[in-house]
Amino acid sequence: MQISRGGFAIRNHTLVRVHTDSGISGLGEGIGNALLVKAILKEQMCELAVGQDPFNIEALRQRLLDSQVYFERQGSAICAASAIEMACWDIKGKALGVPVYQLLGGLVQKRLEAYASDVYWQKDPSDMAKEALRVV
């Protein structure tokens, strides 16, 4: 399938695991160009995150984004910072023994309709159907 941005069949994501000195680890995901996200994490952001308080998420996010002023705090830099931030939310939820949604304001609805606003677009609709069945 073609969309205004063009077609694509593969997406790469970057998974980040953040470990604390108390033995808790959190998992985060960075979307976007995986090579760029990985490079930003490895060469800049991981070093900035080490030793920081994973409960002070806003300050850590700001520290990470401040390191990216030359990239205008957008694109792959945001994706890299978001991966670490997501991992910190996971750590905080585990440490407090609550699901992350409670930390973000609580349950609003018991059920949500699933949708895909930007799936892995294939040129052939039957290939898309096969891929959708595989990931559900």
Label the predicted regions.
Residues 10, 100, 123-127:
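Short secondary-structure boundary/capping elements
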Residues 1-27, 31:
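Structured beta-strand/loop patches that form or line metal/cofactor-binding pockets in enzymes
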Residues 13-15, 83, 111-113:
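Broad gene-expression machinery/nucleic-acid interaction feature
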Residues 7-10, 106-108, 136:
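Solvent-exposed alpha-helices and their adjacent loops that cap or buttress functional pockets
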Residues 4, 77-78, 119-121:
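A generic structural signal for short
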Residues 110-136:
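Metal-dependent enolase-superfamily TIM-barrel catalytic cores that perform enediolate-based chemistry
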Residues 19-95:
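Metal- or metallocofactor-binding catalytic centers and their adjacent structured scaffolds
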